[in-house]
From Swiss-Prot:
Record comment regarding domains: Consists of three domains, a large central CORE domain and two small peripheral domains, NMPbind and LID, which undergo movements during catalysis. The LID domain closes over the site of phosphoryl transfer upon ATP binding. Assembling and dissambling the active center during each catalytic cycle provides an effective means to prevent ATP hydrolysis.
Enzyme class: transferase
Binding sites annotated in the UniProt record for ATP: 13-18, 131, 140-141, 203
Region described as NMP: 33-62
Protein's recorded name: Adenylate kinase
InterPro entries linked to this entry: Adenyl_kin_sub, Adenylat/UMP-CMP_kin, Adenylat_kinase_CS, Adenylate_kinase_lid-dom, AK2, P-loop_NTPase
Subunit field text: Monomer.
Residue ranges, annotated region (LID): 130-167
Primary location: cytoplasm
Catalysis: reaction(s): AMP + ATP = 2 ADP
Taxonomic classification: Eukaryota, Fungi, Dikarya, Ascomycota, Taphrinomycotina
Amino acid sequence: MAGMRLILVGPPGAGKGTQAPNIQKKYGIAHLATGDMLRSQVARQTELGKEAKKIMDQGGLVSDDIVTGMIKDEILNNPECKNGFILDGFPRTVVQAEKLTALLDELKLDLNTVLELQVDDELLVRRITGRLVHPGSGRSYHLEFNPPKVPMKDDVTGEPLIQRSDDNADALRKRLVTYHEQTTPVVEFYKKKGKWAAVDAAQKPEQVWEQIVAILEKAE
């Protein structure tokens, strides 16, 4: 089982946040999300973290080399990575994919697969714009898929529910256009390498999970 290394790709609302912990638990591997890695390096004041903080403080985007450096640091020093890892949020461009390939070659590691969670854009819009949250507890509901017993009221306290402002349809559609523009070339890059697998993420989470396990069993 040693060595399950995969990349998880999917648009906002596709369920990466649900499935990544499942994969992490089943295979005993590390979940490397770029945002978390950045925050951790900045908090620990590592050389990479200091460099990244300087750029972010100026409102810039952290370079691909810094992110690749952080991934290398995790692979070499994070004990959870000894069985493998899930990369989440990277690579987002073909240049990043090439840098990651070079890094894995340097470390003599293979990538098992790239899992793409696929969902129709309009279903994503319905999923995300229907989300309701109870601010006090963080309990979440959905207008269509998991409605509260009383409209717009929390089941437990009866307090009002809110919709998050960044969950509005226009903003989300823009994010999805950007996502597809960025991701399509990356997916093509891995398809050519024979490292890509599609998952129908429009299904219920349990069914998505079954499909993921079936793909990973083959990819071992």
